[in-house]
């Protein structure tokens, strides 16, 4: 079957925002206007098309990235609706990795919120061009220009309106397009009855006068903001700059082309206005997706490495190139089993054919290829460059794996996975649940790389870790619903880490003689602290074979196994460099096991002088409270070992930004509610790991049954 839409007419976009900014409702309206659905489902009624999991419909939030395909004015738009809740940040990250552009949805009353900052930072890391949609213009307190100021103040983003709203709150009646200088005035609730007029024309004046608006004021405002738009875009386009300084009129097509170029280069962020719930501005937002966000042809060729030669390689977006794709999500479907979502960067792929998973070095057969619309599916025979689809039948593929033509191997840049910050103990309620729980947890961990399952070596308990209480709550809930496993769940615990704060060298010597073959392993290892977030690095600096080459991997393995159960309180150790530089062996008695034990002994010896420290997750906390409660909040932060970072006024509220240890935030919602009579709110996002104070460290060590020395 031939390609239905050309690459130039394809858009792969994400819709991302802070929780409750209205992303899913915006996506619903897109599906309605593009003819994908014929009845609009409301998120707050639990009827949304994109929120298809039972938990999503009950909680009114988006947990997984639902993918769907829509068509708009002769273009194919693949849309991924991503969660805004911080606990599901991996869903945003893996979506951004495979998208070409994104729509950032803001709540026009609040502007940029904490999770907006997080997703914006992630999008910047991946170089994703964005347009901004100021949603909820009909809401009490909606302020388009305040939202614009927060983009600059909180994100440092070069955002400029390409539209301005007519009215706000209950009086939000339309939008002026600053590029075309036309207005859209909505005369019915479905947003389908639209009056389009030229700004400043008699018709425009009459329409606004009939609705009690001052047309002259809006004409002036539109001219002023158009001038600012041209001035801003002139920085990125010499032709426009020349025309602007010469006082010449700038044609619509030229202005559009200049905005598109600056947006694709991630120099400029066009800002739009609307109310998805009231069906206003969504069609204009869709037009902006086509006009200003890139097609797969507009972005640089995807970079990778040839696994055979270790040389850099790339794949331009073309059907003629060898097949290359990235698996960005694994999901278990109750009807078809394991689904692997993938983005095709180059080449084509037919159902029933074979691909090579270059990340794992395994051949995989593509059973069926499905095009997804939330949780319904359409079977297709072929996928082309630029497509997003799901494959059935991939047994070994996990998130971040590269799938390529067997004759043209390439490993594409993978997806970075954040470390879990919270953990809890789970145990099956009955013996019958025991085996089922193991299978269920394994399947859930396959789907979600930020979800870890471990067994405590000392107690034999199963410990699950994730990005937050809601994250683990949803996964335990899924275990019950999808796998019919009943489990008892312990109280949430902080996922502490351990590290070394000083450099040292230590010897690990292991010798055992008990008749027959003995054991002999002897190593000298230099330990130094690594950069934060850099993880564990092992270097083999052995010269002259004093430790035979075949035993070196055992030394590394011994260190890794020891680090899994740290030296102070049994927490995983991170950010340490280890250099094996000397040792000795015995011709007969040396073995892998002996060197593994020797490495473990060296690390435990090093702990005596390497100043081991316990690290705790620090959360970036944003607390919004009425002015009269500000004093209480400052007290809350200080009492929780927190540090106030900044404060700002927003209307009659105060916004406090602070860093607070996660350990001190359990139960804070109740404290805040009672001290503000329910008027205060807070959001927290994981920021970094930091050393715990000595007194707290001693408490943690004592609690874990270790000695503080």
Curated annotation (Swiss-Prot):
GO terms for cellular component: cytoplasm. One of its GO terms (biological process) is ribosome disassembly. Pfam families: EF-G_D2, EFG_C, EFG_III, EFG_IV, GTP_EFTU. One of its GO terms (molecular function) is translation elongation factor activity. PROSITE patterns: G_TR_1, G_TR_2. It is found in: Cytoplasm. The keyword Protein biosynthesis applies. The keyword Chloroplast does not apply. Belongs to the TRAFAC class translation factor GTPase superfamily. Classic translation factor GTPase family. EF-G/EF-2 subfamily. This is Elongation factor G. It comes from Lactococcus lactis subsp. lactis (strain IL1403). The gene is fusA.
